[in-house]
Each structure stands twice: as structure tokens, then as C-alpha cells.
């Protein structure tokens, strides 16, 4: 290859679409085309962490939760993403790290509302489950076409030299 040639990948990576319907069960991600064992356990850990936080708030601390602003069940919220309305329901996705209030492994949390005042938490919608997003599901957006919601995001990979590969070059 000479210096003035452009090398293109032989195959464009598949675009994955996540259907939104609440917390994702760990069984959904078995098989070679889905998550590895570490990510499967991450799904379980997110569910356990959120259940423990809900139990704590039931007995104490609920009066300190936000009423009009979105607040994750536990951990860290950042970068609202994919704000849209579909079939009369508003959707708000956000970067989410349930294990550390300072950030950490990034996922996408999901809230819905019919009036933009009362929001219902729907769980984690996107987990880092592929080699091209193994260190986090970063910011992106959503768009609607023909009654289908499409989510897209930036996959994060931390390289051995400490740099980040945001565009999978």
C-alpha cells in the first residue's frame, strides 16, 4: 500500500437496534451473537443494585429524591440522549453508571412520560456488550422512522496506551 491510498474495511459493522421494553433479562443475552459472560453478569449486577436502592428508599431517604428532574435509581446520570416522542409517549435516555456516582462503565438508562412531569424509570436499555463498545456505551441519539425507534451511540474502547478509540478506526 502506498502512502496516498485509503484502506477501507472489508465489511461495515452491523447496526444493532435495541427494542425498548423495560429492564433486560440476562437470559436475553445468551449465545455467541450477544454478550460475553462478563456483560451477562453486569446485567445481573445492575438489576441487583437497583433493587437494593429501591428497598433502601422505601424505608428512608425517599424525601430527598428529585421530583421534577430525572434522577437515576442509584449512581450517576449524564448526557441526556435520544429525547423523542413515539405514540404519545416521551422517551429520555441518558448515560448511566449505577455502580459509581463519579462515572464508570457507561450504559444507557431510560425514562418515559406521557406529560413531561411524571417520569417512569424503564431500566437499562443499552449495555456495553460488543468489542467495539466494551468500555462503555457513550452519547448518541434516537430517531423515529415508520413507527420504529432507532438508537445509535458512540462505542468506547480504551486502548492499551491509555488513549480512547471512539470511532473504531
Question: What spans do the regions from the language model cover?
Answer:
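Intrinsic-disorder-associated, low-complexity terminal segments enriched in Asp/Asn/His/Tyr and depleted
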Residues: 3-4, 14, 33-34
Amino acid at each position: 500500500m502506498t502512502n496516498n491510498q485509503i484502506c477501507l474495511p472489508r465489511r461495515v459493522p452491523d447496526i444493532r437496534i435495541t427494542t425498548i421494553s423495560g429492564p433486560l433479562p440476562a437470559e436475553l443475552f445468551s449465545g455467541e451473537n450477544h454478550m460475553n459472560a462478563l456483560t451477562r453478569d453486569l446485567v445481573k449486577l445492575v438489576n441487583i443494585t437497583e433493587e437494593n436502592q429501591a428497598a433502601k428508599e422505601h424505608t428512608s431517604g425517599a424525601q430527598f429524591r428529585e421530583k421534577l428532574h430525572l434522577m437515576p435509581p442509584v449512581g450517576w446520570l449524564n448526557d441526556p440522549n435520544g429525547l423523542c416522542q413515539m405514540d404519545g409517549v416521551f422517551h429520555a435516555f441518558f448515560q448511566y453508571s449505577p455502580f459509581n456516582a463519579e462515572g464508570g462503565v457507561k450504559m444507557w438508562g431510560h425514562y418515559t412520560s406521557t406529560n413531561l412531569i411524571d417520569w417512569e424509570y424503564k431500566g437499562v436499555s443499552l449495555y456495553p456488550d460488543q468489542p467495539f463498545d466494551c468500555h462503555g456505551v457513550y452519547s448518541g441519539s434516537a430517531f423515529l422512522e415508520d413507527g420504529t425507534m432507532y438508537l445509535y451511540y458512540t462505542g468506547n474502547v480504551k486502548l492499551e496506551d491509555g488513549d480512547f478509540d471512539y470511532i473504531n478506526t
